[in-house]
Structures are given as C-alpha cells and as structure tokens.
Amino acid sequence: MQKKTFFGKIIIVGRTNVGKSTLLNKLIKSNISIISRKPNTTQKHIIGIYTYKLFQFEIFDSPGLQDKYHNIIEKKKIRDTFNLINESDIIIFLITNFIWKNIEIKILNFIQKKKKKYIIVINKIDLITEKKKLLPFILKISKFAPNSEIILISAKKKKFLDILLTNIKKKLPIANHKYISTKKTIYKEKFLITEIIRKTLMHLLYKELVYSFIISDVILNKNIKNKYIIFCIIIVNNKRHKKIIIGKHGEKIQKCILYSIKKIEKTFKKKTLLKIKIKIKKNKFKKEENGNYRNWN
C-alpha cells in the first residue's frame, strides 16, 4: 500500500526586516533569497522548495509590508502578496521587535476572513534583551488569534525551526509531490544572479534610486574551469542616475561588482567574473505625478 504524501503552498508575510528571506533560506537549507539589512529589497516573490520524506512544500518569500505605501510599485507588490495569501494553503505570519500595529491586524483579519491555516512566528528571539516583555506581547497577540499557535524562533541562529516545521507538516494537505526531492527552487541560475546584483545595488543606493534602474540582458557563461563569466546591463533614465550608480571615482559600481561576486560565489560555490555596463534609455521609465518612477517596459 502506497503511503500518503503531503504537499502545499506556503507564504511568509510580515513587515520589512523581520527575517523572511533568512527564514526561507534556513528552512530549505539553501541561499536562494538574498538577505539585506536595508528595507524593501525583496520585490519579487522568491519560491523555495522543501522536501523531507513524505512532506513537500513550496514556500514564498514576499516583499515587506508597510503602514504606508508611497507609489504604485509598492502598492502593486502588496496586492500581489494578498493575492498569494489567498492562493496559499498555509501562511507563516512573521513578526519581531514587539511590533503589533494596524498593518499586522489588517493582515491577520484578511487571513482569518479567508479561513486560511496560519502560524504566528516571533523571530529574532536571540536579540530580545527584555524577556519580561515577551509574555505580555504574546498575550496581546493571542487576543486577536486565540486559536493560533505562536512559535518563538531565531531563524538566523536556526533555533526552534524544528518546532515550526512540525507545525507546518501537521497543516499540509494530502497531495502528490510536485518536484523531485533535490530541487530547492523553481528559478534558474540567471534569475537568482540577477536578484543578487539587483539587491546588492539597492543596498548600496538605499533611497537614492531604489526604483529607477532595471537590470537587463544578463549573459551567463561557464569557462573550461567551470568558472562563471557574467555580463549584465543596468538601464537608467538619465545621466544623473548613471553618475549616482557609478559613484565618485567609480567606487559605488565597483562595490556592487565585488559584493555581488562574493554573494554569487557563496550561493553557487563557483569562482565568478562579473562585468557591468550602465546604459541610459529614457523610454524605460515614466514619471508619475508623485515624482516616483514606474517601470514602463
């Protein structure tokens, strides 16, 4: 008699910088979602795959939620996140720093209205110095979610992830596995490399040009020594933006190249050569009334 298998779709939601990318990477034991301390560097839903014996799930990293959204790009990301919540079997609701405000309540209300299975997870417990605040905070959340598990973890330190995984497995629907057991993500190398370069540049630029560049025409080759040879083009709207990305004496773009190489080599375990060219294409962006740029491609 064939044993039952379990498969489901999971999304991690929460504010910016609560550790969503770190948690995804630690659960699937692979660095597919690039981690940055700067807020809002995750713009796309990164999909990881976990498989262990009879259990398998897709797990989605999502852009960080905010109390206010300043442009149509941010608003679209959040609409996409809510749509994905609607399509998911289980929601991991990640919180930290004793923050429980309107956006958290709004997310929870949406999840409960859709009658979704969910787990509230308090992350970064290793950084909590005032332990006496923890119990009142848990009790506060419990008033909004009386029937939910509240699990305390440290994703970075891999503390109590086994408890989280046990709870996830209990909630997975019975279904056939979708992927081979060794697969960690649906994305190919080129996409992940593009994400690494994009997030590295966003980290270096911070708020200067967060939405005002596109990474295009990524070419990935391997030489006879299995070394990555990567070439990509960064497209900007005008000369001023190009100068900002290049930086004084080329320092910023050189940092982007060096930091990206380091992350690519760590992720793929391959020596890497990276070349970046910056081009100006004015028609790639259209300026909105609020002064923000929208990708018009």
UniProtKB/Swiss-Prot annotation:
Residues 14-21 are annotated as: G1. Keywords: Cell membrane, Cytoplasm, GTP-binding, Membrane, Nucleotide-binding, Ribosome biogenesis, RNA-binding, rRNA-binding. Coiled coil: none annotated. One of its GO terms (molecular function) is ribosomal small subunit binding. The keyword Ubl conjugation does not apply. It holds the Pfam family KH_2. It comes from the Bacteria. It is found in: Cytoplasm; Cell membrane. Residues 197-282 form the KH type-2 domain. Residues 40-44 are annotated as: G2. An essential GTPase that binds both GDP and GTP, with rapid nucleotide exchange. Plays a role in 16S rRNA processing and 30S ribosomal subunit biogenesis and possibly also in cell cycle regulation and energy metabolism. Monomer. Belongs to the TRAFAC class TrmE-Era-EngA-EngB-Septin-like GTPase superfamily. Era GTPase family. This is GTPase Era. It comes from Buchnera aphidicola subsp. Cinara cedri (strain Cc). The gene is era.
